Structures are given as C-alpha cells and as structure tokens.
Amino acid sequence: MAGPQRRGSGAGGGERRDRKGRDGGAGAAEKTAYVERVVAINRVAKVVKGGRRFSFTALVVVGDGDGTVGVGYGKAKEVPAAIAKGVEEAKKHFFKVPRIQGTIPHPIQGEKAAGVVLLKPASPGTGVIAGGPVRAVLECAGIHDVLSKSLGSDNQINIVHATVEALKGLQRPEEIAARRGLPLEDVAPAALLRARAGAGA
C-alpha cells in the first residue's frame, strides 16, 4: 500500500508543479506586456565621512503601446535596481492619452520647468518625428504619427515631463466641440474624421 501512495503523492506534486509553471508563465507574460524605455541614467555622488558614496538614478517611460503611459524616476546603488524602481514608479502614474488613428487629436504645447514641447498631428505613414526623450514617451503611449519640436531646455528630464504635460492636455474632438458649442467637423481635421469613420466601418 505504501508504494501506490507514494506514486499518487508524486503525481499530485507534479500537478502542483505544472500549475505553478503555468501561473509563472502567465505572470511573466503580464510583466512583459508593457513597453519600457530608459531615457537617462545618471550617477550621483554624496559626500560622506571617509569619501564619496555613489548611487544611480534612472528616468524611465512605461506604456502599453495603446494609449496608456507613465513616467517614473528611480534611485538605487545599482543601475538595474534604479531602473526597476523607475518602472514601478511609472506604473503608479499611468494616464490615458486621446488618439485618433495613431496620432493626436489636435496641436498642443506642453511646458514643465524650462522644458517646452510642441506636438502636432500627422497623417498616417508620417512616423514619429521627434527627438529621443519625446519619442520614448510617444512610442510608449502608442502614438505612431506625430510632428514634434522642443522649444526650451535640452535637459532630458524637463523634455520628458513637458511631453507628458502636453499629452495630459489633449482632448477628444467631441469634448472640444461640446465645450465650444461647435459642430464636430469644425474642431477636427476632416482627414482624421474620415479615417476614424473608415476604421469604425
């Protein structure tokens, strides 16, 4: 009797291991569902008794590539740990970005500290015309066609946050039309409305 019981116990253990493996695979897939971009890594020195203590900071952009994006700033003694903290911080600051057929609904300018970023809608196939920091935010947000220009500081942190402010200020054409009391056709480019209507059909 002892032998069959041991075999049964082993089968149960195998089932538990299989279940754990399946769950672990699902968790890994969930973790990699986001697009991550490391914009900047800096080394920071702190003067203490006996010398200097070094740490690293990481500016990270995380998004789902489908209208959700966030920015985080992590600090740790090692680069991988700083990036991991930045990713978690970015996820805590997720926000939704209005889009029409892969571009933004209207031109907008975002400002943060000395950073100033101008974004303009672009027709399909244009691509993301932007510098590194701006491109990281736009691609993580799932914006595929847009024109941009940095009008202020060259500081990457300021540029990223100015881009975030611009995206947060975007409104859907319906919202703009309702606020102004105008027909939808008067506040949104006809090409964008046709493209959206075609996608809906």
Curated annotation (Swiss-Prot):
Per UniProt, residues of the S5 DRBM domain are: 34-97
InterPro entries, alphabetized: Ribosomal_Su5_D2-typ_SF (IPR020568), Ribosomal_uS5 (IPR000851), Ribosomal_uS5_bac-type (IPR005712), Ribosomal_uS5_C (IPR005324), Ribosomal_uS5_N (IPR013810), Ribosomal_uS5_N_CS (IPR018192), Ribsml_uS5_D2-typ_fold_subgr (IPR014721)
Q: Which residues cross the membrane?
A: none
Q: Which domain of life is it from?
A: Bacteria
Q: Spell out the residue ranges making up region: Disordered.
A: 1-28
User: Record keywords: Transferase included?
Assistant: no
GO CC term (a single one): cytosolic small ribosomal subunit
Please name the GO terms of the biological process aspect recorded for this protein, alphabetically. translation
- Keyword vocabulary terms for this entry: Ribonucleoprotein, Ribosomal protein, RNA-binding, rRNA-binding
Which NCBIfam families did the record assign? rpsE_bact
Summarizing the function annotation, the protein's role is: With S4 and S12 plays an important role in translational accuracy. Located at the back of the 30S subunit body where it stabilizes the conformation of the head with respect to the body.
| Descriptive protein name | Small ribosomal subunit protein uS5
Could you tell me which species this protein originates from? Streptomyces coelicolor (strain ATCC BAA-471 / A3(2) / M145)
